[in-house]
Amino acid sequence: MSVTTWNLNGTKHHVLICNGSSCMRKGGEEATQAIRNKVAELNLDEAVHTTRTCNGRCKDAPVAIVYPSGDWYKQVTEKVAHRIVEEHLAGGCSLKESLIYEYDQKGFVSPENSDSIEGIDKVKSNA
């Protein structure tokens, strides 16, 4: 079995695209292909690396996370996927209306007026 090891020197963005079962039922494969195809179309292959994974936000499926900015996008349709590549990765502007979380140097925060669910706390109380 061959294992791929990418040389990521010079990579500017890493996009984690959710391909867990909930996301796949809600268009995760289409979102993945839309992002990858638009990256190729705009000749951004050397600047953008994509990874299929599970991001643990099933209620917001499908989800894509862009680093290094730390922006989490919800309900990524093919149209939103194209906009992520064109406006965020190529243009440097987040899609505020599609954000679940953004990073503010103190940690992840939900944008104002977000309609996304809060989710389960990662730290369990000792109650």
Swiss-Prot record:
Its annotated function is as follows:
Ferredoxins are iron-sulfur proteins that transfer electrons in a wide variety of metabolic reactions.
Q: Which residues bind [2Fe-2S] cluster?
A: C23, C54, C58
User: Which cofactors does this protein require?
Assistant: [2Fe-2S] cluster
The record's keywords, sorted A to Z, are: 2Fe-2S, Electron transport, Iron, Iron-sulfur, Metal-binding, Transport
What is the similarity comment for this entry? Answer: Belongs to the 2Fe2S Shethna-type ferredoxin family.
Superkingdom in the source lineage: Bacteria
The protein's name is Putative 2Fe-2S ferredoxin
Record GO terms (molecular function): 2 iron, 2 sulfur cluster binding; metal ion binding
Q: Which organism is it from?
A: Priestia megaterium
Co-factor note (free text):
Binds 1 [2Fe-2S] cluster.
Q: Record's SUPFAM superfamilies? A: Thioredoxin-like
Looking up Gene3D superfamilies in the UniProt record yields: Glutaredoxin
